[in-house]
Regions:
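C-type cytochrome heme c attachment motif
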Residues: 19-21, 50
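His/acidic/aromatic-lined binding-pocket segments of jelly-roll/cupin-type domains
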Residues: 42-45
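Surface-exposed recognition segments
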Residues: 4-13, 27-30, 47-157
Length: 158
């Protein structure tokens, strides 16, 4: 949310959305080169629209635990559904709101030719990507272990 409490990082009105996001009204039915729209207050581009970002969060209809809203992470061991955020070039403005979340689906990867299926092969979700991030401070070994060794298993041949 880039430190904001509004619907979008630039305010509550959709009127400025064209300045900050690629979405169904302006993207010409495809993702666009990054960095062409205005950044959020933290200087990050394309946080609304263009491609939705697949996160490590487990999807829950209830949302995040109110006790962990400072730095929320809904950790889980299941591969599906995870959370996609930010909306995409193929979405309407409501899906680009800072709080909007979309549950992932196994069908996003159905054309993956690899066995076992890759957790990152997404030819059926061309509106989805991920953002590489790093913390400002190197996490402890215990924290790294909890992040990268979640116990999630790969897809099976179902």
């Amino acid at each position: 949310r880039a430190g904001t409490k509004t619907a979008y990082s630039f305010g509550d009105s959709e009127k400025k959305l064209n300045d900050y996001a690629w979405f169904i009204d302006n993207a010409d039915f495809k993702y666009q080169k990054i960095g062409k729209k205005k950044p959020n207050p933290w200087g990050l581009h394309d946080m609304h629209g263009n491609v939705a970002e697949w996160t490590m969060d487990i999807f829950s209809k209830e949302g995040y635990d109110p006790k962990s809203l400072d730095n929320p992470w809904s950790k889980g061991r299941d591969l599906y559904p995870r959370v996609a955020r930010g909306g995409s070039w193929n979405d309407f403005p409501d899906s680009l709101r800072s709080t909007a979340r979309l549950p992932s689906a196994k069908s996003w990867k159905q054309q993956d030719p690899q066995l076992p299926k890759s957790i990152w092969y997404l030819t059926d979700a061309q509106w989805l990507g991920f953002r590489i991030v790093r913390p400002l401070k190197v996490p402890s070994a215990e924290m790294m272990e909890s992040i990268w060794n979640t116990g999630v298993t790969h897809d099976t041949l179902e």
